[in-house]
Curated annotation (Swiss-Prot):
Family recorded in the similarity comment: Belongs to the DASH complex DAD3 family.
InterPro entries reported in the protein's UniProt record: DASH_Dad3 (IPR013965)
GO cellular component annotations of the record: cytoplasm; DASH complex; microtubule; mitotic spindle
Name used for this protein in its record: DASH complex subunit DAD3
Species assigned in the record: Eremothecium gossypii (strain ATCC 10895 / CBS 109.51 / FGSC 9923 / NRRL Y-1056)
GO molecular function: microtubule plus-end binding
GO biological process, one term: positive regulation of attachment of spindle microtubules to kinetochore
Cellular compartment(s): Nucleus; Cytoplasm, Cytoskeleton, Spindle; Chromosome, Centromere, Kinetochore
Keywords for the protein's UniProt record, in alphabetical order: Cell cycle, Cell division, Centromere, Chromosome, Chromosome partition, Cytoplasm, Cytoskeleton, Kinetochore, Microtubule, Mitosis, Nucleus
Function: Component of the DASH complex that connects microtubules with kinetochores and couples microtubule depolymerisation to chromosome movement; it is involved in retrieving kinetochores to the spindle poles before their re-orientation on the spindle in early mitosis and allows microtubule depolymerization to pull chromosomes apart and resist detachment during anaphase.
Domain of life: Eukaryota
Length: 85
């Protein structure tokens, strides 16, 4: 394997590192919730539902942004007469 990484490869590895850190943090939080005797399951469930709604909203906005960007790029590639360059 080459020692020199491309910019894209470094970016992907950084994203994986960030994802791994987030997953470790999530695991720590879940362990804490499972071992904490003062935790009310109904409260945790309500909080998880709120988080789920927020994540769904962010996902929808992200998909819309990506779709808009793709459309803009496709429109930019077309000539004024409607034919592709």
């Amino acid at each position: 394997m080459s020692d020199a990484l491309s910019t894209l490869q470094r970016s992907v590895l950084e994203k994986y590192r960030t994802l791994a850190d987030c997953l470790h943090e999530l695991n720590d939080t879940l362990v804490e919730l499972n071992t904490d005797s003062d935790t009310n399951p109904e409260q945790v469930l309500a909080q998880m539902r709120e988080i789920e709604v927020k994540i769904a909203l962010v996902g929808t906005l992200l998909k819309g942004s990506v779709y808009s960007l793709v459309l803009q790029r496709n429109m930019g590639k077309q000539a004024p007469g409607g034919k592709a360059k």
